[in-house]
Amino acid sequence: MLEQVQKFLLSRAACEGPDPHTRYAELFHKLDVNKDGKVDIVELQEGLKAMGMAVGKGAEEKIVAAGDTNKDGHLDFGEFIRYLEEHEKKMKIAFTSLDKNKDGKIESAEIMNSLKTLGINISLEHAEKILKSMDADGTLTVDWNEWRDHFLFNPADNIQQIIRYWKHSTVLDIGDSLTIPDEFTEEEKKTGQWWKQLLAGGMAGAVSRTGTAPLDRLKVMMQVHGSKGNANIITGLKQMVKEGGIRSLWRGNGVNVIKIAPETAMKFWAYEQYKKLFTSESGKLGTAERFIAGSLAGATAQTSIYPMEVLKTRLAVGKTGQYSGMFDCAKKIMQREGVRAFYKGYIPNILGIIPYAGIDLAIYETLKTFWLQNYATDSANPGVLVLLGCGTASSTCGQLASYPLALIRTRMQAQASIEGAPQLNMGGLFRKIVAKEGFFGLYRGIAPNFLKVLPAVSISYVVYEKMKIKLGI
């Protein structure tokens, strides 16, 4: 893949000596096709392509953004040289951290051990595939020159960034915040990257939830009203528009968006605390421990913001003019039903975290490992389609497992607002639904729920990527 650029750099090194400045100057003039003393994104893309360098999606933009100190959208000669010199220093640090036995070469076992510390288990065969993609001389080891030439125009600074391609829970927001929280490295915590990633994820979630709010409200209506006339998606949407106009399709969305910030903050804080309890003596957190810590963090976060979940449901099923807003809704619930009403449906909600988060994590990890072992030949970057596919599949399976509990939770939240509806507990509601509507009654409303998954995931990903650029992540 990189034979041309490797030959170019090695030939320059042989002719000009070890001075990297000379090699990089030659490379700059090779990329500066129009000879204006600057290299822009288009020249970088075309030049790297001509030299056989397959860099990741958006890598050229990241390189220009990182090196463009005067923010004119180009890399002049000085900026180009400074960027590569700084990048080479970072690559040297990454190489040294991987070279555990300090023999000046990276071997398959060192690749496996480094990825294992990041929670990725790969086979020896796959570790050798990774090495072969960098190995220019066929020795099945990678020395510093091979490492430098391979990662010369890769904006990733260290091996830990491989895992970042697979961080998905803050990125892919489908409206149900029951996933295991993201992992952040010590470096990300020290540099403040963690809060930028959380902010980007929160913005992505807000836009995604707003974009799919009509389907989310339809799901709630179908869950609460069972087998009434809105069992059909089109019919249900028409009824909502007829009752309250187009704006009614977004009823309850305000609360759904507002609760993202406190829930995300609480989940992140709680996850860090629970991780300390379950981390082994070696300082590592296994998949099982991560699942337990993540589930407990999810339960803690849900407990703290659960009254907002009740408000969202009541607003969604409310009629036009019934509530003037979130605070009016809260006031009326307090006056008529008391404080306990804000925690109706709490038990099935908490019970639903375990199957959702567990299955979502297990399937995502399985798909991730499968892709890395079978398809990650040249890069650990899976690409957008693979990420969206894995995230959608794992979230969908998690929803299937926990949906009956989610439906019972929603009915318990809403039943006091429905005239003549008996106030049943979790067991009573379960028996009533099965007796009246059959087993499939427990999955009432799942069609619009599934229908919103792909657009929600896609919107989340696009907004997240845009926010990352804005925040300089």
UniProtKB/Swiss-Prot annotation:
Pfam families: EF-hand_7, Mito_carr. It is a multi-pass membrane protein. The gene is slc25a24. Electroneutral antiporter that mediates the transport of adenyl nucleotides through the inner mitochondrial membrane. Originally identified as an ATP-magnesium/inorganic phosphate antiporter, it also acts as a broad specificity adenyl nucleotide antiporter. By regulating the mitochondrial matrix adenyl nucleotide pool could adapt to changing cellular energetic demands and indirectly regulate adenyl nucleotide-dependent metabolic pathways. Ca(2+) 2 binds at residues 68, 70, 72, 74, 79. Keywords: Antiport, Calcium, Membrane, Metal-binding, Mitochondrion, Mitochondrion inner membrane, Repeat, Transmembrane, Transmembrane helix, Transport. GO terms for cellular component: membrane; mitochondrial inner membrane; mitochondrion. This is Mitochondrial adenyl nucleotide antiporter SLC25A24. Residues 159-168 are annotated as: Linker region. Signal peptide: none annotated. The chain crosses the membrane at residues 198-215, 252-271, 295-308, 345-364, 388-405, 445-464. It catalyses: Mg(2+)(out) + phosphate(in) + ATP(out) = Mg(2+)(in) + phosphate(out) + ATP(in); ADP(out) + phosphate(in) + H(+)(out) = ADP(in) + phosphate(out) + H(+)(in); AMP(out) + phosphate(in) = AMP(in) + phosphate(out); phosphate(in) + ATP(out) + 2 H(+)(out) = phosphate(out) + ATP(in) + 2 H(+)(in). PROSITE patterns: EF_HAND_1, EF_HAND_2, SOLCAR. SUPFAM superfamilies: EF-hand, Mitochondrial carrier. Residues 216-251, 309-344, 406-444 are mitochondrial matrix. Monomer.
